[in-house]
Amino acid sequence: MIAYIHGKLLEATDKSCIILTPGGVGYELFLTLSAISTLPESGSDVTFYVHSVIREDAFDLYGFPCFDDREVFRTLISVDRLGPKKALAILSQFGPKDLQDLVFREDVKTLSIVPGIGPKSARQILWSLKDKMETLKSATVRSGACPVEGDRSEFLDALSGLRNLGYGDDEVRDFLKDIFDEEPDLDAGGAIRVALKKISQNK
C-alpha cells in the first residue's frame, strides 16, 4: 500500500498530477482543487501523503499535501455510501475547520453545493460525521502544519466568485495563487478585485 510519495512534478491537469519518483516510476494522484491550484511548476520537488483505493478494475491514488487532510479524507470515506470521488469533492470545497463547523451547525444547505451531493445525502453525511467529530477536531488543531498557500477558504471563495463572473478555473488559478502568495491575509473579495485588475492588464 502506497502511503507517501516524494518526487518531481511531471504533469498536472485540473483533477490530478503525475509524480516522477527517483526510481523512474510515475504515479498519478487525484488531488483536491486547492492542492491542484497550489502546485509548483513542472520539474519541482513535491511530496504527498497518499490514500490507495484498490478495486478489480482500478488502482487509484489520492494525494494530500499534509497528513491531516488525508485523515479527514479517510474519515469521509468511512461514511456509508460516500466514495472517494465525492469525499475529494467535499475537501475541494471545505477544509477540516470548515467541515467541522458544517457538522456542528448541521448545515445541509451549504454542504449541498458540492457537485453530486443533494440535500438528502448531505443530511446523511452530516449525521454520520457527528460520531467522528474527534478526528475532525484533531485535524483542525494541527491544520496549521498543512503547507497550503494562502487561506484555503478564501482562495476557494475567490475562485468560485471569479467562476460566477464567467472566468474559467485555468484562466484565474495562477493569478489567485500569485495574489495569495503576495498577500496571504487578503480576503476573497479583495483577491477578486486584484485578480480582475491583473486580468484586464494582461488583455
From Swiss-Prot:
Domain II as annotated region, ranges: 66-144
- Keywords associated with the record: Cytoplasm, DNA damage, DNA recombination, DNA repair, DNA-binding
Where in the cell is the protein located? Cytoplasm
Q: Which molecular function term from Gene Ontology is one that the record holds?
A: ATP binding
Q: Which GO terms describe its biological process?
A: DNA recombination; DNA repair
Query: Mind telling me which InterPro entries this protein's record contains?
Result: DNA_helicase_Holl-junc_RuvA_I, Hlx-hairpin-Hlx_DNA-bd_motif, NA-bd_OB-fold, RuvA, RuvA_2-like, RuvA_C, RuvA_C_sf
SUPFAM superfamilies the record matches: DNA helicase RuvA subunit, C-terminal domain, Nucleic acid-binding proteins, RuvA domain 2-like
Q: Which Pfam families match?
A: HHH_5 (PF14520), RuvA_N (PF01330)
Q: Which Gene3D superfamilies match?
A: 5' to 3' exonuclease, C-terminal subdomain, DNA helicase RuvA subunit, C-terminal domain, Nucleic acid-binding proteins
Q: Where are the stretches annotated Flexible linker?
A: 145-155
Q: Where is this region: Domain III?
A: 155-203
Extract one GO cellular component term from the record: cytoplasm
User: Is Cell membrane among this UniProt entry's keywords?
Assistant: no
* Record bears the keyword Glycoprotein: no
Give the residue ranges for region: Domain I.
1-65
Primary role: The RuvA-RuvB-RuvC complex processes Holliday junction (HJ) DNA during genetic recombination and DNA repair, while the RuvA-RuvB complex plays an important role in the rescue of blocked DNA replication forks via replication fork reversal (RFR). RuvA specifically binds to HJ cruciform DNA, conferring on it an open structure. The RuvB hexamer acts as an ATP-dependent pump, pulling dsDNA into and through the RuvAB complex. HJ branch migration allows RuvC to scan DNA until it finds its consensus sequence, where it cleaves and resolves the cruciform DNA.
Subunit text: Homotetramer. Forms an RuvA(8)-RuvB(12)-Holliday junction (HJ) complex. HJ DNA is sandwiched between 2 RuvA tetramers; dsDNA enters through RuvA and exits via RuvB. An RuvB hexamer assembles on each DNA strand where it exits the tetramer. Each RuvB hexamer is contacted by two RuvA subunits (via domain III) on 2 adjacent RuvB subunits; this complex drives branch migration. In the full resolvosome a probable DNA-RuvA(4)-RuvB(12)-RuvC(2) complex forms which resolves the HJ.
The domain section of the record reads: Has three domains with a flexible linker between the domains II and III and assumes an 'L' shape. Domain III is highly mobile and contacts RuvB.
Q: Which family does it belong to?
A: Belongs to the RuvA family.
Q: What is this protein called?
A: Holliday junction branch migration complex subunit RuvA
**Gene it is expressed from:** ruvA
